[in-house]
Amino acid sequence: MKNYLVNKKNTNEQLKYNKILNVMAIEKVENIEEIYIDFKAEWKKLSLVQRVDLLINSLGKDSRKMLPIEKIIQLVSIIPFVEHSTHISYTSPFSQGKTFQYSKIFPNSKVISSGITEAALFYNKNRGEFGILKNYDIVAFDDVQCLNNDTIASAVYDFLSSGNLSRSNNVVNSISCSSIIFLSNYTEETQKKLENNPYFLKDINLFEPFSDSFQKEAFKSRVIVLPAYLMRDENFIISEEDVYGININVLHKFFQEKLKESLPLFKIELFCKERLKN
């Protein structure tokens, strides 16, 4: 077996997080650099299909149980792991591992499960300190209902379009490339409608879980709406010992390397404007 691969059988003894992580070893790897070099060499040899399946397996889900559309949805949900400033509205039924994915799979992420102030999230004027969005690559709101006032909404709109943490021109280095993930669950009634006809959305508000402050087009047009309602109500968690995924330590290093290569769209726009001036 490749030194960067693990399966359920050889990780059970060290398992400490959650059954979703059965596929990945969580012990520290001392020779991580050597293993990572081997991994990258092997990764180049894999076909697109093999890469997709290996990534999904590495998230703790059995790719063999998933339909092609479900694999695509799963991959889109982890774009923020490798691309800066990718903002996603991820609404789905309960118990699909949404919160776990953003709190454990990516090394520099923060999940917020309660209310938060604008100062704590963006910039504290009194202290002259940046908030959470400056310190983490991914910030996920476990319940979008905690974002329930116009002040927060307005600041979020600005951030989604510009990456700016402060509306003051006097604050230096106030740009952040963090991605924001909005996690929520549909009501039982909406979920049934989506299950009956997931492609007829005329009478369904996909932003139903959000407060009134976030029902404006300025918000809706700036986030990716993940169609997680197309996922079957199945248990995709790996249960067999013949399914292999990437060791979590190697996976973390892989995501971090790809993220460093990423350039946010608003930075590309600023770069183009500067080029035009010159």
What residues fall within each predicted segment?
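AAA+/P-loop NTPase substrate/partner-engagement loops
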Residues: F106-D150
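N-terminal pre-Walker A segment at the start of P-loop NTPase domains
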Residues: K40-H84
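Conserved AAA+/SF3 P-loop NTPase catalytic/coupling segment centered on the Walker-B
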Residues: N135-L160, I175-S178, N185-N197, A218-F219
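Conserved Walker
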Residues: G128-E129, S161-C177, Q191-L194, F207-K216
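Conserved AAA+ ATPase small/helical "lid" subdomain
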Residues: R222-N278
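Walker A/P-loop
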Residues: H87-T117
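A short helix-turn-beta junction within AAA+ P-loop NTPase domains corresponding to the substrate/partner-engaging
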Residues: K193-E234
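Extended, charged/polar low-complexity intrinsically disordered regions
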Residues: M1-S58
